[in-house]
Regions:
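C-terminal regulatory/interaction module of P-loop NTP-utilizing enzymes
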Residues: 1-187
Length: 187
């Protein structure tokens, strides 16, 4: 979004997220009760990219998004206003379980999302871990937060990053071979 100059709106989803959180609701502002548009309506009006982060943490309280995911206008029941999506409006979502829930105990807060809801996302990408070289570049980009550039010690930032990605690769391969129950991410 930054490279394209596009507005980006992120909504962190949790089990309590509902229509009021997403579309908006009545709020007391300066002593008056007014309808305040939520992040979804703002994104629709501005043609923004809307990220529904960790959508598999949601419950059926998010079904108000079904028509929106199809690119249709939405009737705001609380005001009677119809909001049409502006050009460029897109919705993306992240989910550790692709909305299928987690039986292995790794994502205990993940919910099973209604299949009809999931089908409204026309593209699904299974994000793999980056290659060792890419992951090392990611770590080096953020290394100064953890190791000052003038620090002295047993490892240079480059050596530490290489050791971390090598260790992560061993952990991941062991995980995929069912040797351990946990895996590490780049985070």
């Amino acid at each position: 979004c930054a490279k394209l100059g596009r507005e980006f709106i992120r909504v962190q989803i949790n089990p309590e997220t509902d229509e009021d959180d997403l579309l908006g609701g009545f709020r007391l502002i300066n002593g008056e009760t007014v309808f305040a548009k939520g992040p979804v309506l703002k994104a629709m009006e501005n043609g923004a990219i809307l990220l529904l982060d960790e959508i598999d943490r949601a419950t059926n309280k998010i079904m108000c998004l079904q028509g929106i995911l199809e690119g249709k206008p939405v009737l705001v029941k609380k005001t009677g206003e119809v909001i049409k999506p502006a050009d460029g409006f897109n919705v993306i979502a992240t989910a550790n379980t692709k909305g299928k829930g987690s039986d292995d105990g790794r994502f205990t807060a993940a919910s099973i999302i209604d299949e009809a809801f999931l089908e409204r996302f026309t593209v699904s990408v299974d994000q793999k871990f980056p290659s060792i070289n890419i992951e090392k570049k990611i770590l080096l980009k953020h290394m100064d937060k953890y190791i000052p550039s003038n620090a002295t010690g047993d490892f240079t930032a480059d050596e530490l990053a290489q050791n971390l990605v090598t260790w992560a690769d061993v952990i991941r391969r062991t995980f995929y071979d069912d040797g351990i129950d946990e895996v590490v991410s780049t985070r």
